[in-house]
């Protein structure tokens, strides 16, 4: 048994949202009780104590859309590439990288992503992977890294026809095999969706194969209308809009399916998303960085669509994404009073509701029976801090880098900015060698 206390406790439980000197009692994989530190210490005198040292104690965060394959791209410049539009960004950088990823490259990307996520207080990742240099077994390799380090993960492989029929078939098979394996485990730490890249790189025939292989086992995780090219492809080649196309194919939209980006959609398409219970995930920084537009999240909320928040691997800091979401929505809508409730709902409520479709234990909340995913942030405010203004401090005062300790599924995996029972230096050294190998292949030089 463990007590995490001596800090400001944010529970995200509407019945008991905030305790000034709070504590969380953890037993096994679950939260057993929350209360004041004095109460919990008196009730459980023999419990191990994790001292928050006056910081902020809060539920671990969920990143609802990321890409492990980008894990070795930080600092990389590919010679001769100066991408002028979204398609060139994909062709010059991301598809170029994933074509060069072997199994070791994928493993190194997974280490980089998982370690940095945990450092930033992220306890659950929802990943959409691609490594067309080597496909079979990649999701199992990523799963092994997630289990080794201790992060909670929902994984899929992005099916795409961009590298030919053999790679397309392998990517479908990788999804199907991993989804069946994950379903058989009955393990809240690892789950699966069935991935697809985007409509403009997947034919109807391939979508039908994906639906058949999935056979209703899990939901789909697909990019939709991230760029206008996706819309034009559907209109020119299929005589309908992207969501109409998915609806006609059948078996894809639904309550366990999540669509990435969803920037260039019509009102009718949004109505279909709502009617089918399909989820969307917004990635504000990535959309701005790729210059593809701003997702109509306010309209989605007005229609009652379940919208989550991800990063698209632009960052692993969810609080950073929350800040940027607020700024871009206000800028885009030219209204300084919008986006606050939507952004905080996406990150702190909707991401957890999304994972509730794949995880039996409640996430994103510190209450009896919830998963013991807890973080401690070094944050000592110089203005009043209470349940009335928690999110104001989150948006304007806190960052992922404030995170000092991360507990996942009841285990301390990162304490006082050091990983527990993990040789981080050895992992970093090996990952560095893999990144040098990848960069060398991309730039035809030695690093």
Regions found by a protein language model. Give the residues of each.
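Glycine-enriched alpha-helix->loop->beta-strand junction motifs that scaffold or abut catalytic
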Residues: 150, 214-219, 251-255, 272-281, ...
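Divalent metal-coordination and catalytic microenvironments
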Residues: 7, 24, 29, 54, ...
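Active-site gating loops and adjacent loop-to-helix segments of metal-dependent hydrolytic enzymes
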Residues: 72-106, 163-164, 228-254, 276-279, ...
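Alpha-helical scaffold segments that flank or form the walls of functional sites
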Residues: 76-128, 133-151, 173-185, 432-437, ...
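His/Asp/Glu-enriched, well-ordered alpha-helical/loop segment
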Residues: 248-252, 296-381, 395-399
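Metal-coordinating catalytic core of metallo-dependent amide/deamination hydrolases
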Residues: 129, 134-264
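Active-site microenvironment of metallo-dependent hydrolases
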Residues: 1-22, 27-32, 37, 43, ...
């Amino acid at each position: 048994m463990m007590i995490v206390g001596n800090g400001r406790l944010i529970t995200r439980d509407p019945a008991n949202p905030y305790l000034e000197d709070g504590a969380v009692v953890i037993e096994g994989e679950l939260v057993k009780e929350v209360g004041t530190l004095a109460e919990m210490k008196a009730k459980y005198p023999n419990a191990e104590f994790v001292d928050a040292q006056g910081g902020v104690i809060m539920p671990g965060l969920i990143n609802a859309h990321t890409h492990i394959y980008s894990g070795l791209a930080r600092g990389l410049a590919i010679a001769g590439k100066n991408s002028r539009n979204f398609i060139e960004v994909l062709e010059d950088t991301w598809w170029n990288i994933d074509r060069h990823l072997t199994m070791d490259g994928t493993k190194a990307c997974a280490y980089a992503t998982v370690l940095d996520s945990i450092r930033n207080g992220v306890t659950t990742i929802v990943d959409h992977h691609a490594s067309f240099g080597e496909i079979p077994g990649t999701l199992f390799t990523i799963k092994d890294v997630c289990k080794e380090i201790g992060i909670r993960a929902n994984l899929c492989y992005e099916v795409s026809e961009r590298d030919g029929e053999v790679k397309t078939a392998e990517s479908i098979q990788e999804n199907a095999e991993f989804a069946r394996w994950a379903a058989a485990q009955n393990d809240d730490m690892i789950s699966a969706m069935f991935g697809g890249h985007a409509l403009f790189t997947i034919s109807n025939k391939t979508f039908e194969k994906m639906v058949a292989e999935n056979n209703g086992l899990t939901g789909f995780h697909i990019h939709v209308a991230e760029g206008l090219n996706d819309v034009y492809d559907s209109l020119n080649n299929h005589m309908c809009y992207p969501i109409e196309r998915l609806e006609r194919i059948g078996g894809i939209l639904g309550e366990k399916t999540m669509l990435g980006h969803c920037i260039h959609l019509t009102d009718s398409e949004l109505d279909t998303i709502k009617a089918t219970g399909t989820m969307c995930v917004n990635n504000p920084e990535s959309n701005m960085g790729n210059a593809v537009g701003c997702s109509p999240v306010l309209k989605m909320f007005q229609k009652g669509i379940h919208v989550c928040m991800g990063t698209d691997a632009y960052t692993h800091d969810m609080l950073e994404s929350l800040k940027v979401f607020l700024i871009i929505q206000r800028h885009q809508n030219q209204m300084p009073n919008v986006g606050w409730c939507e952004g905080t709902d996406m990150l702190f409520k909707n991401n957890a509701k999304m994972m509730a479709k794949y995880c039996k234990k409640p996430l994103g909340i510190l209450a009896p029976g919830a998963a013991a995913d807890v973080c401690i942030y070094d944050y000592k405010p110089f203005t009043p801090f209470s349940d009335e203004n928690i999110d104001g401090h989150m948006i304007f005062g806190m960052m992922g880098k404030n995170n000092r300790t991360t507990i996942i599924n009841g285990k301390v995996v990162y304490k006082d900015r050091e990983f527990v029972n993990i040789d981080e230096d050895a992992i970093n050294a090996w990952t560095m060698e893999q990144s040098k190998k990848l960069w060398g292949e991309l730039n035809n030089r030695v690093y």
